């Protein structure tokens, strides 16, 4: 049976949690509290095969024209089957439909994101007034995006990448 990419539901959170835990133990993804997953369920897409959730990814809107791709991961046994590409494509399409013009990610998978038009970037690509507004966020991902001292060295040592839509 084929893989379906769809918006996540609250009933998917336990499976998303399992996928995240696998990669966070390997220090390839940031761990997230379960409550944060429920709070952000509307940001997630999942890959479903035969009724099982085998992958996930999220789009987090940061600003009027800027979003972050978060938590793109596929169960190990289903890697190298283009499922991550399908998830990322759904995220990019959603970003465009929301009117976003730029997407960024923090990743070790630079080749994967590069195939989708993301390029390595140093520093935060926002104007000073937007930077000041983003400083008010308590979101750890935004702190890493802004390259704040409080999260240095970069929590995982990953690469900041940006895609212009």
What are the roles of these predicted feature ranges?
Residues 12, 65, 108-109:
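A generic "binding-loop/recognition-motif" signal
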Residues 80-93, 105:
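Conserved acetyl-CoA-binding loop-helix of GNAT-fold acetyltransferases
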Residues 97, 101, 107-134:
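Conserved active-site alpha-helix within GNAT-family acetyltransferase domains
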